[in-house]
């Protein structure tokens, strides 16, 4: 069963893979995009009962892990940029209709980690964009725009992508999302859509019942002036 030791081990595996990719492509800058669900909070009572740590412990541990990961990445790259959106798993109430849209514990995890890392000279922390309440963010890499979106409000389908683009009022180069626990990729009218996996994978009661199972993974994209040049769905054990 997924626990803190497994999480540390998988982050170590991910760091080793990123180091190899950085050397292979001679990359100078890294964008760490936090796509939400950094903890498993209150949205699903069954998941909450299966959690090994309570929510407060999860916030503290996730913040420490993230801070250490950012520090390790800063040792590999000349410049590191950190941007975050919030996920549904960190809301404070099980009923999403009662939840305040921007009230997510992911914000505390990110604040904890980035506060510890703000002294690092080559690490830049992005502030949330006004008007989106932490549900969306937009970054620019080598002149191309990338929309960051957890995915609970926007479906990973052609219709979902079209609706999001209409809402934004512009066509981004790529949309990077998560939410479904498994990596995926598609293109919608030249917009690259990347769905990230998750560190824990599937296997708890909720993901089994809803057929959301997936092996633990994280996705690393190498971006050039043309957009996403290479994509690595990194499997973790």
Please give the residue ranges for each predicted region.
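Core catalytic region of metal-dependent phosphoesterases/phosphodiesterases
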Residues: 3-119
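Conserved beta-sheet core of the metallophosphoesterase superfamily
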Residues: 103-107, 115-122, 127-133, 142-236
């Amino acid at each position: 069963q997924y626990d803190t030791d497994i999480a540390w081990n998988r982050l170590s595996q991910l760091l080793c893979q990123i180091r190899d990719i950085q050397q292979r492509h001679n990359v100078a800058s890294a964008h760490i995009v936090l796509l939400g669900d950094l903890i498993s909070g209150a949205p699903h009572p069954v998941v909450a009962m299966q959690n090994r740590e309570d929510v407060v412990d999860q916030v503290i541990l996730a913040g420490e892990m993230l801070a250490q990961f950012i520090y390790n990445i800063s040792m590999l790259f000349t410049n590191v940029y950190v941007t975050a959106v919030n996920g549904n798993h960190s809301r404070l109430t099980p009923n999403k209709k009662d939840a305040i849209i921007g009230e997510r514990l992911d914000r505390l995890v990110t604040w904890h980690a980035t506060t510890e890392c703000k002294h690092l000279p080559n690490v830049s922390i992005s502030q949330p964009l006004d008007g989106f309440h932490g549900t969306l963010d937009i970054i620019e890499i080598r002149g191309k725009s990338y929309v960051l979106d957890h995915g609970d409000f926007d479906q990973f389908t052609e219709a979902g992508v079209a609706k999001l683009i209409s809402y934004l009022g512009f066509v981004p180069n790529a949309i990077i999302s998560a939410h479904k626990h498994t990596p995926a990729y598609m293109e919608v009218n030249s917009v690259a859509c990347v769905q990230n996996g998750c560190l824990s994978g599937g296997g708890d009661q909720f993901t089994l019942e809803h057929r959301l199972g997936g092996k633990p993974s994280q996705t690393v994209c190498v971006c050039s002036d043309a957009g996403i040049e290479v994509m690595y769905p990194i499997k973790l054990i």
